[in-house]
Amino acid sequence: MQESDVFHNQLRVEMLKKEEDEVENNSEKKKAPGIDMNKVNLIKTRDEDIIAENIKAELKEEEKENMKVEEEEIKEEEEKKEKENYPCMQIIDQEGIFADENQKDRITFEEFIQENTKFKELGFNYNMLSILGPQNSGKSTLLNYLFDTDFAVLNEKNGRQRTTRGVWLGLVGDRKDIIIMDLEGSDGSIREDDLSFERKISLFSLSVCSVLMVNIWSHDVGRYGASNMSLLKNIFELNLQLFQKEDSPKTLILFVIRDRDQRKPFENTKSVLLEDIMKIWESVARPECFKRAPIDKFFDLEFTSLPHFKHDKELFIQEAKELKKRFDCKNQNTYFRPIYNKEIPADGLALFTKQVWSAIKSNKDLDLPSQKEMLARFRCDELIENIFNEFEKEIEEIKLQHSEKHIFNNFKIFCDCLYDKKMKEFMNVASKYLDRVVKEKADLLSEKMLNEISYLFQTQMTLAINYIKTMLTTSYFTLKNQYITEQSSLFDPTKYAGYAEQMDDFNSTIKNEWEKISTQSVPSNIENNFEIEINTLDRFINKLYEIGRRDLIEALMTHFKKHLQNIMKPLLLPLFEQSNQNMWEQVRKVVIETTSQNLQELENGMINSLKMNKDDVEKKLNELQVYIIDAVRSTILERPGFVSNLMENKFISIFRLDDEGLPKKWKQNEDLSKPFFKAKEEAEKILDLFSYIRMDPKDDELSFISINPATGKKMIIEEPENGTIDQTKVLFSLSERLSIYEGFQNMAESNFIRAQQELAAITVHSKTPMWLILLIAFLSFDNIVYVFKSPTLLALTLIIIGIIYSLNKIGYAYLIDSVISYILSISWSSVLYLIQDLGLFKNLLPKPEAPKRKRPQKKTQDDKPKSSILLTHKKQPSVMGDVTMDNIDSLNSFDDAFKLVSQDEKPIRKPLHPLPKRETQSMKVMPMSASFTKSQSMFIKRNPTTTSSLNKIKEANEF
């Protein structure tokens, strides 16, 4: 109840009270004597009760009326709001212009659909209805009552004129799943006889609508012109033009007969109308294949009627509401049956209608299948672009990690899920379009996404393989450096157990990591073009483990060898330095003693620490002889020039020193060849001893110095004549032995020449005649007097004489003789060279000509190397480098393996321990002694005895 009504009721009660008060006052004034006041009061009370009851009844009635008014107002507001929720727009104006982006003064059909997002998601689950009929026949009014739309209706005050211009469209229904099209009237006076626009909009509605509603007045039924049967003929002809396939959807034509005549049975009207329809159908020109086709092959016909809108409005509204129920899809008797659906996707309706109207307007042959195909292609391309852009945004995360050289975790799952998700999104929308086009476009989208995934897969696998290679490099080389460093400590086989466990852990960890990465990095929908690399890396990991195990065993054996060497070295070096003839017998004894003490420790280390089986242990123990030989060899070769020094010491000890170890004093006319050859022969025996490691007693009989049968002279041979040799026991090769012997030969000749000089000095000093001494004293008398007069020169002369006397006393007179001989043998040419070097008499001496240098000639154009014109395209290097399934088995070391994998990624490593130098590195040919100069050559020429002795030496040493 409203406030105004309450106020009026209160006012009425107050007025009644005032009236009662006035009645009481009047009654008291007019009260006559003898009147019973009790009766008066009783009457008064009864009247008041009656008045109160009447007031209450009136108030209740007013309250009911007010509530009813409120309910009607609320209902009107809800209906108004509901109508406002059903938007309408003009899709085609009276000029035939479609509502697209070119029209700035009204909303486009695409924007209209975009605003109604629920409609876009319907797919095929919507229906379209259009109404045709004469102008001002109440089409818009009927639609407004049936679907609660708000189409403009006729205002009779303005006269009968065109109300609906062009084609209007409304979106209605609880789910906004019904599109209503209100078409312009067909017999308007404005267009007169121009039926082209009427035909075009009819064709347009027929191509998109599943239900055509034909509005006909009841009094026009049976009249061809008045009932607008020509429009119906157009519909039949256009339908045959559009839908000629067997599977084309039917169209429902609903005839609504308006202003029904209550006196005339509806069945009679229906039969008359149906008879006219059949006549029109028979008169329609049909293709040959449809000459005898009945009308129900293309159309379903329904008939209904409504009473007069003005004369019987309440009944009209009531029957309109009943008719409205037939447009509810939930109703079993609904007009919107699935067989009538034109199967135009909701999200592509705007584009489809635009294309259809464009073809109709330009009077082109309207091919609906082609239009649907065009729509499908356009929408699918649009979908592909949007979905692929979203796809690229989502894979940016992978690209970011790849750019930072990181492997993307769960690459396979991510790519598979993303691919399936995007394909599902595409199919959810595109499946409503033409299957053939959808399949083609789905393949295109799939190809685009798989190309991107394939590129990412290439990067992922490259990073994964490089990551595993880095793990291999870091793990194995770090471990190798550790157990190589271990070799510098005391030999303890138990320490190698930890290295073996680490290697097993590395191998299992790398294998598991690689298996995890490889299985999680290969998407399901792409071709795995890394199968070769994956299989190669699998074998490469196994091969590196084999190399690592082998190197670890070799490291243990090498450590044992160094251990043996450290034990044997103090015992072997004295034997090698003595170089006795039974040296190798003593060496074998030392080796047997040291090996037997440590062999059990090595065997336990291989079994317990390295987990080697007995066969491999037995095999390694059998190879122990090689390690012993290497230990002996290392002991000898670790001292550069060891054998050369032994030979030189042996030669000097025999040839230059006496039994007490003092330098020999040569006697006049002493024969130097005998001690020389004896010393040389003993030194040669040392070379023969160290030519071969004789760990077998049978090897003692081998000799590497033989007599040349042709010349009868000694020669060094490659292999002994009295037996075969084991190349692993050869200490020096033939070239190395020849180099050692050549150096020894030069040293021996130098010592022999020095001995010859000493012997010659003694001979010259003893053969100087007295008269020569007196002659020199006589000729030098003035100088002698000058010396005696000069205290300085006299003191210097006395000092020199004292030094010479002292040297002569202690046995170094031969040095003085050598100096004197050297001074006497200096030639004038030497004097001239000395003067020239000192810069004396520069102007008198001839200037030596400087050698002319040949200037390098400039290269001409013809001299330049001609480059090849053909440029070969370099093949992209494999991720695995040069490693293949064929050459993996040939790998023998980590260096070889990682060199083949990638030279760029190979770590730069420095050797932890310098290798022992070979003997030949320090065995350069020894030059002649510094004293053996031109003067010595002249001296030898003046002494035929010396010359003949030297010639004998050279003949004996020829090979």
From Swiss-Prot:
Name the predominant localization: endoplasmic reticulum
Its transmembrane ranges are 768-788, 792-812
Residues of the region (Disordered) are 62-81, 849-868
Tell me yes or no: is Membrane among this UniProt entry's keywords: yes
Q: Where does GTP bind?
A: G133, P134, Q135, N136, S137, G138, K139, S140
Pfam families per the record? RHD3_GTPase, Sey1_3HB
Coiled coil where?
9-86
**Quick one: a GO biological-process term for this protein?**
endoplasmic reticulum membrane fusion
Q: Which GO terms describe its molecular function?
A: GTP binding; GTPase activity
Keywords from the named record: Coiled coil, Endoplasmic reticulum, GTP-binding, Hydrolase, Membrane, Nucleotide-binding, Transmembrane, Transmembrane helix
Judging by the UniProt lineage, the source's domain of life is Eukaryota
Q: How does it sit in the membrane?
A: Multi-pass membrane protein
Q: What class of enzyme is it?
A: hydrolase
Signal peptide per UniProt:
none
Query: EC number(s)?
Result: 3.6.5.-
Q: Report the InterPro entries cross-referenced here.
A: G_GB1_RHD3_dom, P-loop_NTPase, RHD3/Sey1, Sey1/RHD3-like_3HB
Compartment annotation: Endoplasmic reticulum membrane
Q: Which residues lie on this side of the membrane: Cytoplasmic?
A: 1-767, 813-959
Topology, Lumenal side: 789-791
Q: Where is the GB1/RHD3-type G domain?
A: 123-340
A GO cellular component annotation in the UniProt record: endoplasmic reticulum membrane
Q: What does this protein do?
A: Probable GTP-binding protein that may be involved in cell development.
Which protein family is named in the record?
Belongs to the TRAFAC class dynamin-like GTPase superfamily. GB1/RHD3 GTPase family. RHD3 subfamily.
This protein is called what? Protein SEY1 homolog 1
Organism of provenance: Entamoeba histolytica (strain ATCC 30459 / HM-1:IMSS / ABRM)
Lineage, please?
A: Eukaryota, Amoebozoa, Evosea, Archamoebae, Mastigamoebida
